[in-house]
């Protein structure tokens, strides 16, 4: 490896104004026509075109009032015709050199309107444009594109005439990928990458760069802070998933990848990665708390999904009036009912009209409780939301020094608790109020049900199809589901976990005895489990989670006895996916004098086995992101850092095996890198974060409220596996397939993001699947207020 720190050679420095400008997000409506011209490599330049955009409907309009504005549609046939372009270089001597050009392209829709003019063969057919495309035209030149030379690019058929100067230090290149935020100084794994998929032109040939130097440049001074050698990482045929058919050749990039390792560069500062003959990355930072912006952004996303309260500046940069609160929401009085119908008995856990008779028959009367979490872009509550406080509390237990009181600017009255625990308290506090209202009204006997929705009595848009926010949803009945053991075990678990966190933080809750709540709820769930309930989703996981927390909290041997029986078959081959990790992770990380050494050993082996499996994925994938190798490309597989087990493993081994701990920590970091910029789209997967991010997530309140759009802190589902050749309408994740070139089956999975806000499975999210796991990883990495947690 070639290394050189603080060399005297000076590249091009950037002014503070330039650095700020290139890290600002693009305004809306966006620029159309030729958006930018960037070099891909020594022989290829990319022209990026945008046809137009969508003017979206507003509150009080119908969704079909969207309007597609095509200001500068590209003639793609003309753009790829032989001799469509000429590229002439102006060398230093002043002489002109014309190069032979071959044009290739990729195109996709990146803005979609929500309408269906006609319905033919079970598909929407529109008589007007229903999307706006973006195009990337790759001009392959037989003569090399030299650093420092000026190039004149002309296409008479496109009425295009532009000039550009390329150089490795000053010219941005989308082929150079970095974490757009940056890296910790003590990171054991700082990597940038060189790769590109060029549509029908194949992929960038990285082999000529292997062994050649790269440079990490101090952004303002232009001083070369580090030089290393480009190394080949993996080929385009390298498998990156066990799931066949999700992406061509089981590779999410369809590109050869080379990497640039600058792990030993630890000096804080602002830098860019420069590769001669290609160009440079955007400016990034090396800073101890570099992940804090990502953590705070995602936590604002969690806050934004609180129901029942008014959200407004200075806590959030928008105004959403209080929804679904019988006391605060005008017109919602007497609209929330309790039904004895358990959601776990229904034919569909979302909603089905087949279940409506049972829901109606079970209604016992009104409820006044408010303040659950909205699930996603819609407004319902699910038992899976138990994962939100669990995940936030686990993040705190993993790295308590990383979190403080006041940093998230929450609307809650200050208590001295770290803000992450204040947010974690939100749902248990709602469960407490729900449980005690059910008892006081004689509706219930001590349990709760967490499926709360209005789906059985109307749609989100109302009877007239008029767009509205959650605070305007007042013309239908909402129901809270009947007491069930799954929801109640979940509540018992987070109540006990919260008590443990209060104890660890040296605080107490003056208004709720969480230990008592946990034990009473656990006992109710155990006594009210019906035949078959134990086979419902999350039943065993929440029961295990509750047992773990209650044993740590109380030391009661009955909980340990149950745990020992339930974990008798645990081994290093046990895999703890999703909510299966909850109890074991908390058992290992919580501070408690009651830990059973046998249980610690069992949980440790299972967690480390799971972490090793997640980390093996990072080793095998070119861009080093971890997770479940067998997870299909859906619900956030390409957007969300699901590596909690690796984070736990890093802490569990910190004293016993520091080398292993550092490896685990590095895998969490490189996973975060992927979701914060090293991905093929060169964007973060958090709305509002960084210069490039998801612009149009499916989130109805943000479409209609006043303030910043899109809402900050949303991590969408993102790229989704193809399920049909043709989507049925704009709400279908396959609707965008018709907008792409080459055909969708040739598109690498990681580039199948179309910014289709009409499609829940592409643009939506859930707080439990996407936001909370992201908050855990970025919070774990963000470093303490005094760089605590430094490794």
Where are these regions (language model features)?
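Flexible helix-coil transition and linker loops at the boundaries of alpha-helical arrays
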Residues: 481-482, 530-535
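Aromatic (Trp/Tyr) and acidic
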Residues: 29-39, 43-133, 137, 181-182, ...
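Low-complexity, Pro/Ser/Thr- and charge-rich linker/hinge segments at domain boundaries
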Residues: 17, 21, 166-190, 280-325
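Sec-dependent signal peptide recognition
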Residues: 1-8
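Carboxylate/His-rich catalytic cores and anion/metal-binding grooves
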Residues: 418-447
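Acidic, glycine-anchored loop motifs typical of Ca2+
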Residues: 409-420
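Solenoid-like repeat scaffolds
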Residues: 567-574
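Ser/Thr/Pro-rich, low-complexity mucin-like regions
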Residues: 129-168, 270-279, 783-785
